[in-house]
Amino acid sequence: MDFLFNTNAQFFIAAYLIGAIPFGLLLAKKYAGVDVKSSGSGSIGATNVLRVVKQSNPALAKKLGAATLLLDALKGVLVLLFAYFYGVSEATLWGISVLAVLGHCYSPYLGFEGGKGVATGMGVMMFMLPLETIIALVVWALGAKFIRISSLSSLTALGALIVASFILHPDMAHAPVIIIGFVLLYKHIPNIIRLFKGEEKRVV
């Protein structure tokens, strides 16, 4: 158990456990009285919170969706900030980033189920690769405006971020970016299937 006293290990554990907090599920249950895991797409993320709560309270849906998006984005950044000011290596920061996303997508509080990782991934990437993330957010915003399908906008933005990271930082180790990208892509497989079938719902 000596590894638990290792600083890096402590940050890794914190990143996973904090990343695993299902803010969307908690907020929707407390303030709207709905279980997003058994409604809509079953995801705990901001999009499903907005979609499910909107059916009964559109004004509240926007507030809870925004709060979920913000909290999911910040939960990985919080640990990164502590670790950064503690002086850990860049490799450790990337490890924290990956584990925060894994925590959100495979939460031990939810039987290792979870969300799709978009907001949490966006948060850690904004910290680690800010310019690439800004490019991805612009792509996402354009997709949201013209396509109006959340999953397709997110996947397009993910692709833009990965490509931008190779162009702007060709010499960096891209393994963490690829891992996060793969996890997000894997979690979106049901959405991709619905896209091909023309069944994916739009979120306005």
From Swiss-Prot:
Statement: the UniProt record of this protein carries the keyword Ion transport = no
The way it spans or sits in the membrane comes to: Multi-pass membrane protein
An example molecular function term from Gene Ontology annotations:
acyl-phosphate glycerol-3-phosphate acyltransferase activity
Q: What is its EC number?
A: 2.3.1.275
Alphabetical keyword list: Cell inner membrane, Cell membrane, Lipid biosynthesis, Lipid metabolism, Membrane, Phospholipid biosynthesis, Phospholipid metabolism, Transferase, Transmembrane, Transmembrane helix
State which residue ranges cross the membrane.
8-28, 76-96, 122-142, 166-186
Spell out the reaction equation it catalyses: an acyl phosphate + sn-glycerol 3-phosphate = a 1-acyl-sn-glycero-3-phosphate + phosphate
Q: Which GO terms describe its biological process?
A: phospholipid biosynthetic process
**Primary enzyme class:** transferase
Subcellular localization: Cell inner membrane
A cellular component term, taken from the record's GO annotations? plasma membrane
User: Which pathway?
Assistant: Lipid metabolism; phospholipid metabolism
Residues in the signal sequence: none
The subunit field of the Swiss-Prot or TrEMBL record says:
Probably interacts with PlsX.
Q: PANTHER family attached here?
A: GLYCEROL-3-PHOSPHATE ACYLTRANSFERASE-RELATED, INNER MEMBRANE PROTEIN YGIH
Family, according to the entry, reads as follows: Belongs to the PlsY family.
Function summary? Catalyzes the transfer of an acyl group from acyl-phosphate (acyl-PO(4)) to glycerol-3-phosphate (G3P) to form lysophosphatidic acid (LPA). This enzyme utilizes acyl-phosphate as fatty acyl donor, but not acyl-CoA or acyl-ACP.
The protein's name in its UniProt record = Glycerol-3-phosphate acyltransferase
Annotated organism of origin? Sulfurimonas denitrificans (strain ATCC 33889 / DSM 1251)
Which classification does the entry list for the species? Bacteria, Pseudomonadati, Campylobacterota, Epsilonproteobacteria, Campylobacterales
